[in-house]
Amino acid sequence: MLSLDFLDDVRRMNKRQLYYQVLNFGMIVSSALMIWKGLMVITGSESPIVVVLSGSMEPAFHRGDLLFLTNRVEDPIRVGEIVVFRIEGREIPIVHRVLKIHEKQNGHIKFLTKGDNNAVDDRGLYKQGQHWLEKKDVVGRARGFVPYIGIVTILMNDYPKFKYAVLFLLGLFVLVHRE
């Protein structure tokens, strides 16, 4: 049987202790947001950490791998580099390798991508009439990764009840934990 001792702990708290715990929770959330914003500034990427959601980049990256990105304007995009990009009309960014670069005489660069595990290039994924990606489409470039750590994110997206259970337990831990 599940022990509900934590409810007794919450009931025993006076208003000041409960207020302190809620304030603690707010500080944790604020700190996490500040760290995220700081990473955005340092890396130059709107999303400095992403999770690989499909097997299209195997064997380089597997579903659930956590990627660390940078997006420095001064760094040129190179063939073979792994980029994370957004396509207009799609919410989720895509992680694929640069296959070809098309450079115009004015210095404007366009490029074509492909997943390592895919048979064809990504032109079928781009919006209709678009044959190349531009630098403005890039969210970041992979600079490092941690294998399978992001599987928790995938589980939370695939199973919303799991997500709410984890968030509830984390919130409860912060409220009940004294220190």
Swiss-Prot record:
It comes from the Eukaryota. CDD domains: S26_SPase_I (cd06530). Residues 37-179 are lumenal. Changing residue 121 to N: No effect on catalytic activity or protein stability. GO terms for biological process: response to virus; signal peptide processing. It is an enzyme of class 3 (hydrolase). GO terms for cellular component: endoplasmic reticulum membrane; signal peptidase complex. PROSITE patterns: SPASE_I_1, SPASE_I_3. Keywords: Endoplasmic reticulum, Hydrolase, Membrane, Protease, Signal-anchor, Transmembrane, Transmembrane helix. Catalytic component of the signal peptidase complex (SPC) which catalyzes the cleavage of N-terminal signal sequences from nascent proteins as they are translocated into the lumen of the endoplasmic reticulum. Specifically cleaves N-terminal signal peptides that contain a hydrophobic alpha-helix (h-region) shorter than 18-20 amino acids. This is Signal peptidase complex catalytic subunit SEC11A.
